[in-house]
Amino acid sequence: MGRKLVRQFRYPMRWLSFLASGVPVILVFPAPSLSYLAWFALVPGMVLFTRAATTREAVARGWWFGAGYLIAMLYWMAPEIGPGLVLLGAVMGWMWSPFAVAVHKLLRPGAPWWRPLAAFIVVPSCWLIPEWIRSYQGLGGPWDLYGASQWQHPAVLALAAVGGVWLVSVALLMANVALAVLLGAIRPAWFRPAAGALAAPAIPEGKGAPAVSAAGRLARPAVALAAFAAAAGSGPLAFALTAPFPASRQIEVTLVQPGVVNNATQRTDASETLTAALSKDGTLAVAKPDLIVWGESSIPDDLTGTSAADQALLKQIETLSRADDAEILADQDTTPPGKGHEKWAVLVNPSGVQGIYVKTRLVPFGEYIPFRAQLSWLTSISKAASSNMVPGTGAHTLTVTSPSGATAPVDVGVLICFESAFPDMSRVETGQGAELIVYQSSTPTFQGTWGPDQHASLAAIRAAETGRPVVQAALTGDTVAFDARGRQLAWLGQDDRGQVTVPVDLPAQADKTFYDQAGDYVMWSGVGISVLAALVMLLRRRHFLANTTGAAGGRTAEYDADTGNPVRS
């Protein structure tokens, strides 16, 4: 079995073309943001999988496809992990093999009618497998989940309020399956293995296969078109049927983006200057902020420390908070006594530090190296973390209050940078009573790449999922704000410098989306369906295995479970 699978990786140029087939799919994400392609971008890959002569070849093709997709998706991480990116793609590409096998088994020409129908459920479920596996921090985190490509379309994102980003992925996959079924009905030759490939021959009508009537030939295109319409219309329908949560009140949030400043002290000075400008340029007369958010790693000192430098910086921020009558959420890298290196979000008002959140989900290779004992060599050829940071104990809210008491307290869910990729963290904070989700970010290593734009777009997904407005203040990268349905309120791009004050409508703490309450049921349903489909496939395969009589050495032949024809593997 192992040798047969390895043989599928022969002929390098041929398989490099399958590697390349996964690359164009990333155009659906920022910065290109060709989101409309997501509705059909997977069809070419599906054609390649159905043209595989055997299941093993489909496994290999899916592996190559996944490797190309993953490497292209994370190309901007090359400075962090160097050649480790290629290794990551090669090792993790297998996750797309179940998807390839499902397509190969269910969308081949001549398959019985029930297989294309099953494909509408099984294929999207198998696509969720790599998205589910990657959702674990140690395996890279759920970056560029397929549903996240729709971040610019609040009507489609309405599905996220029902089933998270996973349900948006399912709708997109169903649309791709529908187009593949339609194309297979119109041009079946495109889906057949290449001439000379060893595969089960199709049975001509009248010789073991039932005759297909004219009505039957029209059924598949009709079903495919109906399924595509249902998938494409599901988001707008959900958007129309679910009214937005009524605003319990409105607050003003100022997001500060100093831009690329390499010196740590100068970074703090830049944030302070932009914050001080609020009370000097008349901004407060127009829109007085209730909260001011600085970016990740915005200060070099420990605001809880006792040194003269620590206390001096704390006094400066307290003075700014008093002048603007708003609490300031800063961010620092710190090493508490007796602990390792941590990253803190620190809430400050004129009376001092009011709350701290410690970053829980750390960036693989950027803030720690998984399996450091085995992969420490990456530090000598890349910018991978020289030492592992220590994670916090979990997400929790901070309570923002007005120094003058002019506005009522606001419970805010505070998360840092990479944590915006994880749907569960913002959902946990919403469950704890968060009325607003705040992210602090800094992406200087990736400035000028697609990475910061992809990162910022995730705020729209988290807003739609939780029914909470989401803001992100970036030291470098993109500073953004979205309302509770994922509609864009503000965007400062990678080359921008300044501050923006955004009015955000806060829902009542008791208001929850269905996804807030039900959790990741779509993802777990997909995993269950995939496992069930795999069991069915294995049982049918076992039932139709037979020993070929008279074959030298007693070779075993595999028979197709539906046609009874031998399949050469």
Model-derived features with residue positions:
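Membrane-embedded alpha-helical bundles of multi-pass enzymes
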Residues: 2-240, 448, 459, 474-479, ...
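Active-site catalytic loop in hydrolytic enzyme cores
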Residues: 77-81, 110, 135-163, 342-423, ...
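Soluble catalytic regions of membrane-associated enzymes that act on cell-envelope
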Residues: 235-365, 397-409, 414, 418, ...
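Short conserved micro-motifs at the rims of enzyme active sites and ligand-binding pockets
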Residues: 265-267, 368, 449-450, 515
